[in-house]
Amino acid sequence: MSQLSLRAGCVAGGLLACLALPAQAQFYVLSDLGSLIATSYSVPHGLSENADVVGYSYAGLGAHAFIWTAEGGMQDLGTLGGGNSYGKAIGASGAVVGYASAAGAEHAFVWTSAGGLQDLGTLGGANSYAKGVNAQVRVVGQADTASGAVGFVWSLEEGMQDLTGLIPDPGGWTIEAGLGINEQGVIVAMGRNVFGRVHALLLVPVLDE
């Protein structure tokens, strides 16, 4: 089948048909995802393997996190009681993470279709920000402490944990942010060493003996 016929079939079949195109296809079909109110704006931040999109859109009194799907369009995920929320990443299970204003601060959240928006709390400081999530709904991000910002990992079973504290021998590194997590639990993070240098770091989980 030629690229031209692929393109024609894609246009005729709509967005879902286009998603089945091979990666080397040379044509694209543009789809306007809209906004939460007609005269507003929308900003995407994350994309799943199923082409579900997360981000935020102005909703009248502030920006609200959204999830967009080909089947359901754009859905407002609400807030944590403050004026704003921002969707930042989406996992393979459809869980969305980001952060939202809450009681004068900003807190990391996770949203699921079953549980809605959940405040992940902090590590004793004012703010926290979720930046990545995997299919098991393990969340990574950054949270304030009394001594500065640190990277965290969160799970429903264990809550929010300081990533540096989970490394038996960090070798002088302090994890300042968890930025992504894959299905094997491997975390990509940003850290600072005792000389003040900031590096990209990879954290590989070790099974308990």
Predicted regions and their residues:
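Bacterial N-terminal signal peptides that target proteins for export
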Residues: 1-11
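Bacterial N-terminal signal peptides
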Residues: 9-20
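Residue-level hotspots at or immediately adjacent to binding/recognition sites across diverse folds
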Residues: 4, 21-209
